[in-house]
Amino acid sequence: MAPKGKGGGKAGKGGDGGSSSEGKAQGPKGGGSAVKVRHILCEKHGRAMEAMEKLKSGQRFSEVAAQYSEDKARQGGDLGWMTRGSMVGPFQEAAFALPVSSMDKPVYTDPPVKTKFGYHIIMVEGRK
């Protein structure tokens, strides 16, 4: 039973040039089924850009989130562990594309991600 066409399953030959370490996500980004996410949510693009400027000037993500985020759960923007399928499309795509980073050296979405809720600046603190 050979697989039809190209692309296909996880066991395909040639692959993406990496050794297949099963279980854990490969490399610092992509893969995994859950991410530990922080975000800053602003309804207005201008406010999201103000928050972005604060981040770029070196202010801590959690402080900027507390000051700017309009999310009801204002715990420094911490959303905790989120699984695939539990987030709106553009947010999920961005979250799973980001590398894991820390508060000291955050890697976040620039420009902010637009969803039906507003504009999100997203950072990922963990992946599993």
UniProtKB/Swiss-Prot annotation:
Tagged with keyword Nucleus: yes
GO terms of molecular function: DNA binding; peptidyl-prolyl cis-trans isomerase activity
Biased composition (Gly residues): 1-20
Secretion signal, residue range per the UniProt entry: none
Top-level taxon in the UniProt lineage: Eukaryota
EC identifiers of the protein: 5.2.1.8
GO biological process, any: rRNA processing
Region (Disordered): 1-36
Purpose of the protein: May be involved as a ribosomal RNA processing factor in ribosome biogenesis. Binds to DNA.
Protein name in the entry: Peptidyl-prolyl cis-trans isomerase NIMA-interacting 4
Organism: Taeniopygia guttata
The encoding gene: PIN4
